Amino acid sequence: MDRLRSHKAIFLLLLPVLVGCSIGDVRRPPPDRSSASPRPAPTVPTPSRAVGFDEVRHVRVAVDRRYDRPFVEFVDADHGYALFAACDGVPPGRGCTALLYATVDGGRSWQALRHPRPVAEDQQLYAVPGALVLLAEPYGWYTSTDGGASFVHTTGGEPAALVAARGRFQVAEGVGAVAEWDGAALRPLPAQPAVPGLNTVGHSGDLVVAAGARDGRPSAAVSRDAGRHWVSTPLPWRGDDVGVLRAVIAPDAGAWLVGERPDRTGFPALWRLVGGREWALVRAVGHPAQARSVAPLGAELVAVTSPDGVGVVAGGRYYRVDWPLTGEHHLTVLGDGTILARGPDDVVVGTGWTANRRWVRVVLAGG
């Protein structure tokens, strides 16, 4: 009876995005992969019909047309940054300096910021809660905690703001151990989980999940007391190889494991933590052979983009959904639960809860 109620609840969550679907939908063919290594054959593509955005925010700023498309990153649904960092494919120079912009209204408007090192061999932008971090090689890092009004310059390893953004518990690089960030350094915990090939940590409150894969076999351990004690938690496994295992905490604090395939393109294995100590293998009957991105949304739902389009795993099945996204969009979930979908030509922001979203296409251009 409980399972029946759960399936009914999941169906009600999905109903608003399923009502527009039809069995005869025609989908765009997958991109040409002839130059890549052999991969599993995808399901026969038949694309989804065009679905409109709820809003399009297309803004032009005073940037010379020689500049390439900017890199745009959002911290939450409202706050984002954009970096124009090349002209005609060439890194910024004296005649093409890096340009920095910020938005505080979800991309409706953009304000120019002073870039602290506009000429460099390579430019990168990282936007995390509470900080904007720029990397201008070979000069180092520039960190702002006031929305880009001022920057602090550092060299060497990643600045504290970037490390802190990964969470209180992390895997210490080069050590292969679960470590705790104390505000200044990552310090390995006295008690360590027995996880072969440890490579990922996720946490919510005092719950800490550590996982990894070795020789294709996934394994995990769980701590309920902030890493002081660990319990090995066997994973139901069907023998299909896992290349990289990722721990993901959904917006509702649910813990998931995503088992990426060795070729990084095959549809991944999925597990959900049940009762705090047991992993349930999540089935996805009808899923495509490949996946570009996977993002747990909460309420036992997982969003997927693939060469076949966009879908959601729910109640043991894979459902195609009427979202205005393509298989080229890569999904991430921001700290406020917003879905960020990055495509080759745009960034799409999806606000709302679970599968019911308001989709806004954000386009920033010069000229």
Task: Give residue spans per PLM region.
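Asp-box/BNR beta-propeller loop motif
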Residues: 49-57, 101-114, 142-153, 181-188, ...
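Structural motif
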Residues: 91-99, 140-142, 176-180, 216-220, ...
